[in-house]
């Protein structure tokens, strides 16, 4: 029972530990929002080329 308070204190300290990035940022790193914008733009171009409507994906024919 003596270990329980120590265990609880350690659990409380874990979330307050400072965050450390596993990999340092490089000049090639891209923000996630920019990645999503690029993916969205690519999908919109694909839909326009295929004559698809984005709300009804089943109207798209691949191939």
Curated annotation (Swiss-Prot):
A GO MF term: toxin activity
Superkingdom of the source species: Eukaryota
Subcellular location: Secreted
Cited Pfam families: Chi-conotoxin
Leucine amide: residues bearing it: 62
Swiss-Prot/TrEMBL keywords: Amidation, Cleavage on pair of basic residues, Disulfide bond, Neurotoxin, Secreted, Signal, Toxin
Propeptide, residue positions: 20-50
Record InterPro entries: T-conotoxin (IPR031565)
Signal peptide (residue range): 1-19
GO cellular component: extracellular region
Cystine pairs: 52-59, 53-60
Tissue: Expressed by the venom duct.
Family: Belongs to the conotoxin T superfamily.
Domain description: The cysteine framework is V (CC-CC).
Function statement: In vivo, low levels of the peptide injected into male specimens of the Siamese fighting fish causes an immediate aggressive display in this fish in response to their reflection when placed in a mirrored aquarium; High levels of the peptide suppressed this behavior. No effect is observed when injected into mice.
Name of the protein this chain belongs to: Conotoxin p5a
Taxonomic classification: Eukaryota, Metazoa, Spiralia, Lophotrochozoa, Mollusca
